[in-house]
Amino acid sequence: VESNISYAELVEQRYALEASLMKATEQGDVVKALESWVKLHNSVKFLNHLRLGQTLEAARISAAVTRTVIRIGAMHAGIPPVVNDHISAVSSTIIRNAHSIDEINQEHERLIREYCQTIRRKKTTGYSSLTISALYYLEHSYAQAVTVQNMANELEVSPNYLIAQFKKEVGITPL
């Protein structure tokens, strides 16, 4: 594939698209984030063919870069590190276990949607990082036996502080 665009221009374009994806994610704008991801994905397609070929390994490498860009956007949006790390780790496992490039691309979309939903929830609720982390923990641990002690350990706070803060913000205790 030949192009009239110089390598430097392609790199600048890719960085601009990564910044656009990061900003859209930070704002919780799923439509713009998905549009940015598609543009970014399409902008590097020909590079994949030139350098690595369109392989599963190349798609996994691309996914790691994209996940990092999205995670930084979420960090800038104030998503607590424990939530950010959990979302990212789940995605990493899905990517590692993917058997096709299509599965990896579907995971990109799922990841963007999950991050944007989490960011929008943070923006609209006004809850503290601790309460958002506790809510996220509860939502994603429903299949396990959840205790206040386990949740407090995961969030690195005392059980009493977790209960008091959660009740102050939400109006009920976490469990």
Language model features: what each stretch is:
Residues 81-86, 126, 147-149:
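Short acidic alpha-helical/loop segments enriched in Asp/Glu that coordinate divalent cations
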Residues 13, 55, 123, 127, ...:
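Residue-level marker of regulatory loop/turn positions in helix-turn-helix DNA-binding domains and
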